[in-house]
UniProtKB/Swiss-Prot annotation:
It comes from the Bacteria. It is found in: Secreted. It holds the Pfam family CAMP_factor. Residues 37-100 are annotated as: IgG constant region-binding. Keywords: IgG-binding protein, Repeat, Secreted. Sequence repeats lie at residues 158-168, 169-179, 180-190. This is Protein B. One of its GO terms (molecular function) is IgG binding. InterPro entries: CAMP_factor. Its main location: secreted. GO terms for cellular component: extracellular region. Protein B belongs to the group of bacterial Fc-binding protein.
Length: 226
């Protein structure tokens, strides 16, 4: 019988570990590219783009094996930290849309610092974990920031809710109104969509006006579907 040496076992384990990390990075890449479309023009656009760069560099490092610029022992921590980046961005888009702009500015900055640390080949595992903890603490801190008042100028995050409503309305219109309902119904709904786009593009529109436009557009769609 052949005797399996510790070196062979370690090599197999390392290969399995590298394969698992590569699969995780592929998943992260898909998630980040999906998020990218939703954060254009926001405080999260830069960290998302840099996180995508991190994924590609780590994938290259895993393929390069011993030639990597990263310490192989630290790659696992970097991959784990990328998951924390994705979770932090998701948290921000879900919970900070109605907060004052500073909440998103601070959160975007904190996430960017974490991504930079992941990218830094000289960053230690401890320093990466410390930055992850800083981001988690920041999540709790920004939740205490004031909410936007109805009379405050709408932020890009407030407007994103209207933007989604516009796209959803267009999609439903093309599927259930166009060539299904009479032209008058189609035309009336189009006017409501055009008005909503005007509100969204208005740099001085208030939170209250955006919220009201969402309600108006939803009502226009329901009327068209009757």
């Amino acid at each position: 019988d052949q005797v399996t040496t510790p070196q062979v076992v370690n090599h197999v384990n390392s290969n399995n570990q590298a394969q698992q990390m590569a699969q995780k990075l592929d998943q992260d890449s898909i998630q980040l590219r999906n998020i990218k479309d939703n954060v254009q023009g926001t405080d999260y656009e830069k960290p998302v783009n840099e996180a995508i760069t991190s994924v590609e560099k780590l994938k290259t490092s895993l393929r390069a094996n011993s030639e990597t610029v990263y310490d192989l022992n630290s790659i696992g921590s970097r991959v784990e930290a990328l998951t924390d980046v994705i979770e932090a961005i998701t948290f921000s888009t879900q919970h900070l849309a109605n907060k004052v702009s500073q909440a998103n500015i601070d959160m975007g900055f904190g996430i960017t610092k974490l991504v930079i640390r992941i990218l830094d080949p000289f960053a230690s595992v401890d320093s990466i974990k410390a930055q992850v903890n800083d981001v988690k603490a920041l999540e709790q801190k920004v939740l205490t920031y004031p909410d936007l008042k109805p009379t405050d100028r709408a932020t890009i995050y407030t407007k994103s809710k209207l933007d989604k409503e516009i796209w959803n309305t267009r999609f439903t219109r093309d599927k259930k109104v166009l060539n299904v309902k009479e032209f008058k119904v189609y035309n009336t709904l189009n006017k409501a969509i055009t008005h909503a786009v005007g509100v969204q593009l208005n740099p001085n529109v208030t939170v209250q006006q955006v919220d009201q436009e969402i309600v108006t557009l939803q009502a226009a769609l329901q009327t068209a579907l009757k």
